[in-house]
């Protein structure tokens, strides 16, 4: 067995694209080797990446494919042999199979007798396969954006390819791509090592060889190095700690090859600015880590990750340069904050008429009006359900929510939209409920983010997003495939998350009603089915990927209705709790069998399954087993319905499971599809009656046996 190393050296790759590309390259190489039967049992795949390279190391690679014996079938025997002598057809087939005519065999098939031959297919060498296949795998790697860099050449890639390494053991495989031929030579850190080539003696020495050339190719090792350096440098400031920011750690990990960390400072006067502004400037614009004191308050320091290992003299120069840049950014922020206060948010509302939301949907002023109407309807629904809402604060927050788009601070630091509005609202004397709702309006931006902490903030977020979704669908801008230019999936994810985690008494139907009735877009309700399917798809995603419910549990509860998000999740929780019990598993299997019987009967009759009657004639139940099932179901149905009405779904499901003896006996003793039409129809009606009576919590036929 051998090890295989493949590296692509590039000009600097955008940091946000590296992780996915590293994973895809490793997957493609491993799948290629697996597909070609070149991987031994116990093989391992290791991925590497830096801003200038993607690499994969595979152990347990066979030198060649095993020879394979193939059974080939040729022409009919009567055509291949005449009077016992081979014809040209037999000779041609023997030549194709690579055997002598005498080795041909008679093969009997259902279609008759044919000529057959056993042929040994010689396994190809691994280096031959890799040389041929790797260029296609490289070209197939997905990048959000590609570029051409060789005039008149067809290759596209994220950045120009500078070098490649392809080693099978110590053997170089001269793979060619984009005018570059692979060798056993890579390059170290651009500054710390220079342009001198670095020879890789063997695949297993890849990481160590690069380490000596001041490149840490292993991403996790680099991430650990950065975190360790952050801890170490922060300890030089008494009582300080760096503010945890995993996303920023990840970003700088993909921006560096040999990272180190430098501490800088800024004037304490800037701490008068809101912390959110300071942290955004440091994190989003400069890739600096914030430093806080023991109480968790921002300290006048920052940490920056460098892609070098500077001397003390160089570090002082770099520190001074970073401090100067940050000081300028903070001065800008302070200036914008001061200038913006001269016009209140309330006086900025009319300015939204000149800020376009979408060319077909009008300005943000119109958007605000639509959101307000939706919010009024949602507020009424919540109050009707017995929950108190500060409607005045909600509507004031809606009115002012988008006004910060006209501020200089948001124009310069767009990441702060919403947050700036909330801060300005508080500074200008708006109520705390108003300020909080505005501040949190864009949360959650991802499934990891919290929902707004106040009911008013939750309703503002819902009204804003559902209005956008409905109107975008109405003008034909729904997401397609991987394209979602208006982030409607993110908006729908937020709708589901707010409804679920806020436990809001608002159904998806009523949510869409509010948006459709409030929209000024013609035929806003025309896309209702599409929008509802879209929201249910996001609910399915949330339940499976965020809450972690099994796919069959999710399918089962969604099939029974998904208009109430909170209720749907409660049913999934109850179903998850009982699905493993023996009685419930048997009931689920019986329901699956029942559904199959009804489907087959409906197909045979040429009608829809739902149209089959559930009206049972008790006088046409001659078998004791079917009588017992009918009586038990009729007695149990109101009990289950009462528990369901109380939302006691677990107890309801446990009651349904008590029907197992009667269900088992029915299928053991009763033939449903009998010749007698009346009897058959009545038994089908009994099955339909049982299914309809006990499927309002979940469609148990969706449950898969563990």
UniProtKB/Swiss-Prot annotation:
Protein's organism: Acidobacterium capsulatum (strain ATCC 51196 / DSM 11244 / BCRC 80197 / JCM 7670 / NBRC 15755 / NCIMB 13165 / 161)
Q: Which family does the similarity line name?
A: Belongs to the class-II aminoacyl-tRNA synthetase family.
Give the protein's recorded name. Glycine--tRNA ligase beta subunit
**What GO molecular functions are on record for this protein?**
arginine-tRNA ligase activity; ATP binding; glycine-tRNA ligase activity
Q: Which SUPFAM superfamilies match?
A: HD-domain/PDEase-like (SSF109604)
The main location class comes to: cytoplasm
Q: Which domain of life is it from?
A: Bacteria
Q: What class of enzyme is it?
A: ligase
Record-listed E.C. numbers? 6.1.1.14
Q: Where are the transmembrane segments?
A: none
Q: HAMAP family under this entry?
A: Gly_tRNA_synth_beta
Q: Which Pfam families match?
A: DALR_1 (PF05746), tRNA_synt_2f (PF02092)
Gene behind this chain?
glyS
Keywords recorded for this protein, A-Z = Aminoacyl-tRNA synthetase, ATP-binding, Cytoplasm, Ligase, Nucleotide-binding, Protein biosynthesis
- A single GO cellular-component term on record: cytosol
Its subcellular locations are: Cytoplasm
Query: Could you mention a single GO BP entry for this protein?
Result: arginyl-tRNA aminoacylation
Q: How does it assemble?
A: Tetramer of two alpha and two beta subunits.
Instruction: Indicate yes or no for the key word Aminoacyl-tRNA synthetase.
Output: yes
Recorded catalytic reaction(s): these are: tRNA(Gly) + glycine + ATP = glycyl-tRNA(Gly) + AMP + diphosphate
């Amino acid at each position: 067995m051998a090890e295989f190393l493949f590296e692509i050296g590039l000009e600097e790759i955008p940091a946000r694209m590296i992780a996915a590309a590293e994973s895809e390259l490793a997957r493609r190489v491993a799948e290629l080797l697996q597909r070609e039967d070149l991987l031994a049992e116990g093989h391992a795949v290791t991925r590497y990446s830096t801003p200038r390279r993607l690499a994969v190391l595979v152990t347990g690679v066979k030198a060649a494919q095993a020879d394979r014996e193939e059974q080939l079938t040729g022409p009919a025997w009567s055509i291949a042999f005449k009077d016992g002598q081979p014809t040209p057809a037999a000779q041609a087939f023997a030549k194709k199979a690579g055997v002598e005519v005498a080795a041909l065999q008679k093969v009997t098939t259902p279609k008759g007798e044919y000529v057959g031959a056993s042929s040994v297919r010689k396994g190809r060498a691994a280096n031959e396969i890799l040389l041929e296949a790797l260029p296609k795998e490289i070209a197939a790697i997905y990048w959000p954006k590609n570029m051409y860099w060789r005039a008149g050449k067809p290759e596209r890639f994220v950045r120009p390819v500078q070098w490649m390494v392809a080693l099978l053991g110590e053997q170089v495989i001269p793979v060619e791509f984009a005018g570059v031929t692979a060798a056993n030579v890579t390059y170290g850190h651009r500054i710390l090592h220079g342009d001198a080539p670095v020879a890789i003696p063997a695949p297993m020495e890849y990481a160590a060889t690069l380490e000596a050339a001041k490149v840490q190719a292993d991403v996790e090792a680099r991430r650990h190095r950065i975190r360790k350096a952050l801890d170490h440098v922060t300890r030089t400031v008494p009582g300080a700690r760096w503010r945890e920011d995993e996303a920023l750690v990840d970003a700088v990990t993909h921006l560096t090859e040999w990272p180190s960390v430098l501490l800088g400072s800024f004037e304490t006067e800037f701490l008068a600015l809101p912390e959110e502004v300071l942290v955004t400037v440091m994190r989003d614009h400069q890739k600096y880590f914030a430093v806080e004191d023991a109480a968790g308050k921002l300290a006048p320091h920052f940490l920056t990750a460098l892609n070098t290992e500077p001397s003390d003299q160089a570090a002082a120069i770099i520190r001074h340069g970073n401090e100067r840049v940050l000081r300028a950014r903070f001065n800008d922020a302070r200036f914008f904050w001061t200038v913006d206060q001269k016009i209140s948010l309330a006086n900025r509302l009319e300015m939204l008429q000149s800020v376009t939301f979408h060319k077909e949907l009008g300005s943000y002023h119109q958007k605000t009006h639509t959101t307000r109407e939706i919010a009024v309807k949602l507020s009424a629904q919540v109050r009707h359900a017995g929950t108190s809402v500060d409607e005045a604060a909600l509507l004031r927050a809606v009115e002012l929510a988008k006004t910060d788009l006209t501020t200089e601070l948001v124009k310069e630091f767009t990441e702060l939209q919403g947050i700036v509005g909330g801060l300005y609202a508080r500074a200008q004397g708006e109520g705390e409920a108003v300020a909080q709702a505005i501040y949190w309006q864009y949360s959650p931006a991802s499934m990891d983010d919290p929902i707004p902490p106040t009911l008013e903030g939750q309703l503002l977020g819902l009204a804003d997003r559902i209005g956008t979704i409905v109107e975008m669908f109405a003008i034909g801008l729904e997401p397609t495939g991987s394209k979602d230019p208006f982030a409607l999936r993110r908006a729908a994810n937020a709708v589901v998350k707010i409804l679920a985690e806020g436990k809001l008494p608002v159904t998806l139907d009523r949510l869409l009603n509010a948006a459709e009735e409030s929209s000024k877009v013609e035929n806003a309700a025309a896309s209702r089915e599409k929008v509802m399917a879209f929201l249910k798809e996001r609910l399915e995603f949330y339940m499976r990927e965020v809450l972690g419910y099994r796919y069959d549990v999710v399918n089962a509860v969604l099939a029974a209705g998904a208009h109430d998000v909170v209720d749907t999740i409660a049913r999934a929780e109850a179903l998850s709790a009982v699905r493993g019990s023996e009685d419930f598993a048997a009931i689920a299997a019986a329901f699956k069998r029942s559904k199959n019987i009804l489907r087959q009967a409906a197909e045979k009759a040429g009608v829809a399954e739902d149209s089959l009657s559930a009206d049972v004639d008790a006088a046409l139940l001659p078998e004791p087993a079917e009588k017992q099932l009918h009586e038990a179901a009729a007695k149990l149905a109101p009990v289950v319905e009462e528990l369901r009405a109380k939302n006691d779904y677990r107890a309801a499901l446990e009651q349904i499971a008590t029907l197992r003896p009667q269900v088992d006996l029915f299928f053991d003793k009763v033939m449903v599809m009998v010749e007698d039409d009346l009897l058959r129809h009545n038994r089908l009606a009994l099955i339909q009656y049982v299914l309809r009576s006990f499927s309002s919590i979940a469609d148990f036929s969706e449950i898969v046996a563990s």
